[in-house]
Amino acid sequence: MAASVTSVRLRLLRGAALLAIGVAVAGCAGKSNITTGSIARTGKPVGEMNASELRNAADSIGQAYEKNPKDAATGINYANVLRMNGRNEQALAVMQQVAISNPNNREVLAAYGKAQAAAGQLEQALNTILRAQTPDRPDWRLKSAEGAILDQLGRSAEARQRYREALDIQPNESSILSNLGMSYVLARDLKTAETYLRSAASQPGADSSVRQNLALAVGLQGRFQEAETIARQELTAGQAEANVAYLRSMLTQQNAWKKLAADDSGNTN
């Protein structure tokens, strides 16, 4: 039965890592020049909002979008919040309209590509990201996003090359190191993944999503208590509970907690 345990672990790792990388791709626009990653009315970062606040933010920005659907900044912010609410198809529809109105805007093309990736349109997303990139002024965010998409397409060697190119432009950037670590999660090399993710989490400006990815890599190795401790770090009680819920939701796919615990204790019969 060892082969079936390996198969279960492979499916689990791929499903969990793709979700985490998808979050990284979706969040990448939060550091761009066109969007601040926070809602102007409250000044609160999107990543720190609870579910109710995210719904309210979607309603508020949605009203601004309806008034001026051609505005790039409003459209990108709206799509970001929609993705945080799990409304990927609607986010993609928003970015399609914004891209029609701003066909040469590099930030819009980047956000459009990320929306396509979040909606599962990976080949289209890759093409859009490549259109947004300029060889004479390469953007590390686009390099990292391209790598994340390539990882989801199963092209890990190319993906890691893009991450390293991004690191050449922006050394020690936490989001790039995090995506590189998740690439090794996909390859089931959890020790290497943990090394990169710990480095990512130690960088100035590392956000909650980076710690979530580290917690995932630790949890997938069976160190569940340590994973929860990482997920709770430097957050308010509400944010910590949200992070732990996120971690558990990923690790409970296909009864992951039980399967991995049994596997780690040597129960392969």
Give residue spans per PLM region:
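N-terminal leader/linker segments that initiate helical-solenoid repeat arrays
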Residues: 22-77, 81-85, 93, 269
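Structural marker of alpha-solenoid helical repeat scaffolds
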Residues: 67, 100-102, 132-136, 169, ...
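Helix-start (N-cap) detector for alpha-helical repeat units in TPR-like alpha-solenoids
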Residues: 72-73, 106-107, 139-141, 156, ...
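Terminal, low-structured helical/coil segments at or just beyond the last alpha-helical repeat
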Residues: 33-36, 204, 208-210, 214-269
